[in-house]
Amino acid sequence: MAGAGSQHHPQGVAGGAVAGASAVSPTAAGPGEDSSDSEAEQEGPQKLIRKVSTSGQMRTKTSIKEGQLLKQTSSFQRWKKRYFKLRGRTLYYAKDSKSLIFDEVDLSDASVAEASTKNANNSFTIITPFRRLMLCAENRKEMEVWISSLKSVQSREPYEVAQFNVEHFSGMHNWYACSHARPTFCNVCRESLSGVTSHGLSCEVCKFKAHKRCAVRATNNCKWTTLASIGKDIIEDEDGVAMPHQWLEGNLPVSAKCAVCDKTCGSVLRLQDWKCLWCKTMVHTACKDVYHPVCPLGQCKVSIIPPIALNSTDSDGFCRATFSFCVSPLLVFVNSKSGDNQGVKFLRRFKQLLNPAQVFDLMNGGPYLGLRLFQKFDNFRILVCGGDGSVGWVLSEIDKLNLHKQCQLGVLPLGTGNDLARVLGWGGSYDDDTQLPQILEKLERASTKMLDRWSIMTYELKLPAKSSLLPEPVAATEEFYMTIYEDSVANHLTKIVNSDEHAVVISSAKILCETVKDFVAKVEKAQDRTLENTVVAEAVASKCSVLNEKLEQLLQALHADSQASRVPPGIGPAIPEEDTVESASDESLGESKDQLVNDIGKPSSQKAVKPREIMLRANSLKKAVRQVIEEAEKVMDEPAVQPSEPVSPSCDYDTETDEAKEDDAKESLSAKTTSQSPDAQASCGHPQTDSVAGPAMATTKENLPVLNTRIICPGLRAGLAASIAGSSIINKMLLANIDPFGATPFIDPDLDSLDGYSEKCVMNNYFGIGLDAKISLEFNNKREEHPEKCRSRTKNLMWYGVLGTRELLQRSYKNLEQRVQLECDGQYIPLPSLQGIAVLNIPSYAGGTNFWGGTKEDDIFAAPSFDDKILEVVAVFDSVQMAVSRVIKLQHHRIAQCRTVKITIFGDEGVPVQVDGEAWVQPPGIIKIVHKNRAQMLTRDRAFESTLKSWEDKQKCDSGKPVLRTNLYIHPAPDLATEEVSQMRLCSQAAEELITRICDAATIHCLLEQELAHAVNACSHALNKANPRFPESLTRDTATEIAINVKALYNETEALLVGRVPLHLESPHEERVSSALHSVEMELQKLTEIPWLYYILRPSEDEEPPLDCTKRNNKSTVFRIVPKFKKEKAQKQKTSSQPVQNWGTEEVAAWLDLLNLGEYKEIFIRHDVRGAELLHLERRDLKDLGIPKVGHMKRILQGIKELERNPPNLV
C-alpha cells in the first residue's frame, strides 16, 4: 500500500501498511497449526455513528482509560493518530483531547483481539456487531493495558492495574486474529469458519475458536488458573481435592486417537470429540465418561502448578500456592520483544502448555510479579526466554528478593547475542515454538552450576589527563627513586636481622643483593655521563666500591651464621635461578649471593655467629648506601650534568618463590601508605611519569616494565613496541613500593574497601571499555531510533559489522592506554597500544566468540570457567582482531586472570563502557569489578539425557506399545525387604546427621551455605518422603531417590572440603562435618550391596582421577550420582557372573531386556528357555516360539553369537 498521505505510522510499519496484517497463503502454516499472520480486512457496512457535541458527557463521566492510539482508516489502510477515552461502556475518540466532537463506539457486545500471532506493531481490533476498529499502541505493554481495560468493561468489573491480568482469573478468552490451514469450526455456533483460509479468532491460551461475530457470545471457560476457576468440576475424595480434566470440544488433529478405545477420533466435517487442555488426552464423546476422571497433567506435569494448588491469597493480594501439589514448578518469563517479536509466539505457547498464571511477559510488569508468586516455594525453577539483558533483569530482581538459594535459572535464547545461553548448553538461538515440550523435558533433566556475578562499582571524580602528569624537573623523580632504594635496603636489612624464618632471610638477602647491585649500576651509568666533573665522579665510584665491600662483608657474616645453624632437611624452599645474565664485574657478588642462598638451607654443626656482628655489618651497609646517594645527589645538582634516565619499575614477580616476597611488598607498602579514599588514591602526591605519554618517556629497552609471565601472556609482550629489559630483582622490589605513574599505589592499601563507590550494575557475562563498548553504544542508539531495522539476528550482525568497519577507519580510541589505567588484584598492569579492554566472566563474547582464545589450561593460565570466581582480562587492539577472533582462536591479546579489576579513567571526557551488551558513557573516575554473589544456573546435560533415554527405552511396556512420556519410574515399585529397609534407615540417619552438621557450620561460614544449599534442600526433600513410623511407605522408588540425593550431597560436600580448592572450616565444625561425611560414605558403600542400587551407586568406568589441589576449581553442583569408591568390589562382581550355560529363565529374560526385546520375555519363560537351550536356538526355533518379525529374529541370533564370544554381566 502506498499510504502517501499518512502522517503517522505505528512502530514497525513502513509506508503505512500493517506489518501483521499482510496476506498469507494457507500453506504457510503446518497442518492443524495457526499461521503467523492474518489477512487484512476491510470494515463492513457501518452503522451511522452519531456525531454531536460530547463535551457535556466528557465532564459527567469518569474516564477509565485514555491516551493516544493509532487508528487504521478504511482508505488504503492508512494510520492516523487519535485520542481515545474509555468512559463506562463507551469508547470515544477524536483528533485530540480538546476536541468538542467525539466519535463513540458502544462496547456492550464488543470483543477485543490482537491483530496476529507475532503482532510486531502492537495492534489490536475492537469487534462490535456493526464495525471493526483496528488500533495500534506504542508498545506491547500499552496495548495489553488497553485490552485489559476493555475486557474489564465487558465483564462489568472495575478496572484497576492489578497484580495479574484480569482474564487470567476470570476465565475470559484472549483472542487474536489468525488463519487456519485445515477446516476449523466455531466453538460457539458449531459452524465452519467462512473463507478459504478460515478467518476467525482463536484464544491464545486454550485455542477456543470463534467467528468474529460470535466471540462476544463465547462463554468464559478459558484454561483454569486457580482453584476458584475450576468451580463445580472439582473432584473431592478422602485424600482431599484432585485435578479433573478440562475438555475442549472439536478441532482435533488428523492423527488423533482415542485414549480409551485407541481408534481415530475427531472429524474435518463437524465439531466432535474432546481434548483435555492439560494432559492433551483425546477421547470420543461416548468414551469420555468411562475415562479416568483425574487428570495426570501430561508430559509437563513436573513443571506445572495445578490450579488446585493456587487456592488462597495472602495479605498483599497475591495467590498462595499449596506446596504439596508442586514438585519443582517452573516460572516462565518471556520477553515479548525478543527475536523480532518471536517472544509473543512463545508467550502464547507456554500458556497452552502450563498454567497461564505461571507465565509472565517481562515487557508487562517485569519479573517482580512472578517472583512474588513463587517466593514461598522452597525450591523452584525459572526459565527466561529472551536475551542476555532479560536474564540480567531477572537475576537483579532475584537479588532484591534474596531468592538465590531457592531457585535455579535456565535460558531459552531468543535475543541477539545469547552468550550465556551458549555457555549453559542451550544454544545460540531458538525459533521453533512447536518443540517447547521437548525443551521443558530437557529442562527437567538439566544439571545445576554456579554462575559468578560481579558488581560494577563506580566512583566518579575528575582526574587530570596522564599527559599532564609528567614531571617538570626529571631530577625530582631521581631523588624519589633514590629514596625508595634507601628505604628498601633498610627494610630488607631489618628483615634479615630480626627474622627467624629461613624463607624470609633467603628472599630478603636475594632481593638485597640485586637491589644494591642494580643501584650501583644505575649510579655508575649516571656518573659516566658526567665527564666535566671528574672529582665528583671519582667520589661516587669510590663510595660504590665501599658499598660493594660492605655488602660482601654482610654476606660473609650471613654465610657463617647459616653454617652454624641447624635446619631440618627440606625446609628451605628452592630459589629459581634468574634468567638474566650477570655481568663480569658482578661475578664475585653473584657467587657470594648463590653461596649464601645454598648454604642457608643446609644443616651444619658450626658455632653460630653472634647476632650483634650481623647487626653491625647491616648498619655499615646502610651507611654506605646513604653515602652513595649523597654523592649521586651532588652529581644531579651540577648544572652541566645530563640527568640519568629514571628507573622504570617492573611487575615481574617470580611466582615460583616463597610467598614471603609478597609479604615483603605488603609490609613495605604498609609502612609508607595509609587507608585512603578513592580520591586520594587516584591523585597521589608523587611526581607522575607515563611510559607512553610523551617523548620524555619513550618506550625503550631501559624503561619499559617487564610484564608478569604468570599474569601476562608472552604474546601480549610480543605486541609491545620494544623488547623488554630491566628484569633484575630491583624492578620487582620497586613495584612492591611504587607505581610508575604515581597515580595510585602499586598495591591498593585497602583493596576490599568500597567506601564512596556505588553499584552501577551487575555483570554476568562480560565487561568492555573502549572500542567494543562504542560499537555496542552506537548499535543500541540505532536500534532505539529505528527498531524496524534491527528486528532479526542477521540484520543485527550486519549492523555490528558496519559499525566495526567504520571504527576501523576512525580509530576513535587508538590511544586508550593513555586515558585509562588497569590494575588486576591490586597490581598495576602496563598496557601496550590498544583500543579497548574486555573483562570476561564466561567463555563467550559478542555473540559466540571465544575471545579468550581457548577452553583449556596451559603453562601460564588456567582454563576459563564461570564458576571459579576468576575473571579473564584481554586487550582489544582493533576491530579486525574482533572479527578474526570469530574464526581463529587468538591468544596474543591475553592480559591476566584475576579476582578483582580496577580501571581508572583520566581526563575530562567519559569513555564508552558496556556490560553484557548494554552500553553507556562512563565519566572520568574509577571502576572496580568485584565479586557479588553466585546464581544457580540450569545447564543442559547431554550425557545424562542420552543415558536416561536408553534407560527409558528399556522400560517400555511388555506389549511393545510406546508410552507417551516415560517417567523415571513407570510401574508401581515393589516393596523393600526387611534388610533393605534397615540399611536405608541407617543411610537416612547418617544423611540427616550430615545435614545437621552442615547447617551448624553454615551459621559461621556463609560460603558453605551458598555452595551446598541446593544439594541439602534436595536431600532433605527426599528424606521427608520416607516416614519412619510407617516402614511400608518406603518403596523402591523412594529409596532410589533417597540414595541418589544422598550421594549427590556426599559428592558436593566432599568436593568442597577436599576438592581442588578446599574450604577451611574452624576445627570443631570441620571435624564434625568430616565425621558425618565419613559415616555417609560407609552407609553408601553398604547400599551398593543391594543389587538394584548397585548400578546407581557404583563407580563409573571412565571416572576422573582424584582432583589435583593445585589446579583450578571447576566444581559445580551437577548431580554426581557416581561415587568415588574404589572399584575392587565392582570388578569382583563383574568377574563373578555365571556362564551362559548355567542361566535360568530370569537371566534369559534380563538378556532380552538388554536387546530391547522385552516383549518376548513371557514367551521364553513360558517355554522354559534357559541358557543351554538359548545357545542352540536357530531361526526356525524362533519362528516356532511365535516371534513373527524377521528383524527381531536377526537381533536375537546376532545376540546369541555375541554370547558365545563375550558373555554379558547380569546382576
UniProtKB/Swiss-Prot annotation:
Composition bias, Polar residues: 52-61, 670-691
UniProt-listed Gene3D superfamilies: 2.60.200.40, 3.30.60.20, Pleckstrin-homology domain (PH domain)/Phosphotyrosine-binding domain (PTB), Probable inorganic polyphosphate/atp-NAD kinase, domain 1, Transcription Factor, Ets-1
Ranges annotated as biased composition (Acidic residues): 576-589, 653-662
Iron found in the keyword field: no
UniProt-recorded Gene Ontology molecular function terms: ATP binding; ATP-dependent diacylglycerol kinase activity; protein homodimerization activity; zinc ion binding
Post-translational modification: Phosphorylated. Phosphorylation does not inhibit catalytic activity.
InterPro entries noted in UniProt: ATP-NAD_kinase_N (IPR017438), C1-like_sf (IPR046349), C1_DGKeta_rpt2 (IPR047480), DGK (IPR037607), DGKD_4H (IPR054474), Diacylglycerol_kin_accessory (IPR000756), Diacylglycerol_kinase_cat_dom (IPR001206), NAD/diacylglycerol_kinase_sf (IPR016064)
Family matches, as CDD domains: C1_DGKeta_rpt1 (cd20848), C1_DGKeta_rpt2 (cd20894), PH_DGK_type2 (cd13274), SAM_DGK-eta (cd09576)
Function: Diacylglycerol kinase that converts diacylglycerol/DAG into phosphatidic acid/phosphatidate/PA and regulates the respective levels of these two bioactive lipids. Thereby, acts as a central switch between the signaling pathways activated by these second messengers with different cellular targets and opposite effects in numerous biological processes. Plays a key role in promoting cell growth. Activates the Ras/B-Raf/C-Raf/MEK/ERK signaling pathway induced by EGF. Regulates the recruitment of RAF1 and BRAF from cytoplasm to membranes and their heterodimerization.
Record note on quaternary structure: Interacts with RAF1 and BRAF.
Designated name of the protein: Diacylglycerol kinase eta
Organism: Mus musculus
High-level lineage: Eukaryota, Metazoa, Chordata, Craniata, Vertebrata
